[in-house]
Amino acid sequence: MRRDAAINRERLVRAAEEVFAEQGPAATLGDVANAAAVGPATLYRRFANKDALVREVLSGFFRRLIDVAVIAEQSPPEAGLDVFLRTVGVELAAKAGLSAPVWGELAPEPLVEELRRRSTELLRRAQRAGVARADVTPDDITAAVWALRGVIQSERTDPAHHGHELWRRHLETILRGFRSAAG
C-alpha cells in the first residue's frame, strides 16, 4: 500500500472510531469522510461499505479491551478482575457508540473469544485468591459488561441521567456482589 493510501486509511479508521463512538449506528459514511477530511471516493476505495469500516473499528476496540485484560493480569489476583471491569467501564463510557447492540454481529469473533478467555482467567485467579465468590461464572462477567453497556447507553439517551456516570455506581454494586465474604 502506498504511503499516502496508508495514511488516509489510518485517518479514516481514527475518524470512524470517533464518529461512531459519538453517534453510534446513526453515523453515516459521509460523516466519517468529513471527519477524516477525505472524499467519499477515498473512503470507498478503502472500505466497501459501512459494515467493513465498523468491523475494522470494532477490531481496534476489542484489541484495546484485550490490552486492558493483559494489564489486569499483571495486577495481584485479588485486584485483577476489579481493574479489568473498571477499565472496561471507562472504555465503554468513552466510546459508548461503539457498544451499540446492533453492531454485535460485526464484532470480530476471534477477538471476542480471546477477551472472554482472558476475563475468565481473571475471574478464576480472583476465586483462587478467595476474593471472588466460587459461584460467579464467566457468564456473570459477560452479563456485567452488558449491564454496564446498558447503563451507559441510558446515560447517553436519557436527559435525566446524562452526565451522572451512574455506570460507576452500578459497577460498584456488581463488584460487591462478586466478592466473597472473605474478600
Residue spans for each PLM region:
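C-terminal peripheral helix-coil segments that are non-catalytic and often amphipathic
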Residues: 83, 116-129, 147, 154-183
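Hydrophobic alpha-helical connector segments
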Residues: 56, 66-93, 104-108, 112-116
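Helix-turn-helix/winged-helix DNA-binding modules
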Residues: 24-25, 45, 133
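Amphipathic alpha-helical interaction segments
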Residues: 11, 31, 52, 79-87, ...
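Alpha-helical DNA-contacting segments of helix-turn-helix folds
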Residues: 47, 54-61
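All-alpha amphipathic helical-bundle segments outside canonical DNA-binding/catalytic cores
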Residues: 107-111, 128-143, 161-165
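Short hydrophobic/aromatic patch on the recognition helix
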Residues: 37-47
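Basic, helix-initiating cap at the start of DNA-binding domains
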Residues: 1-35, 52
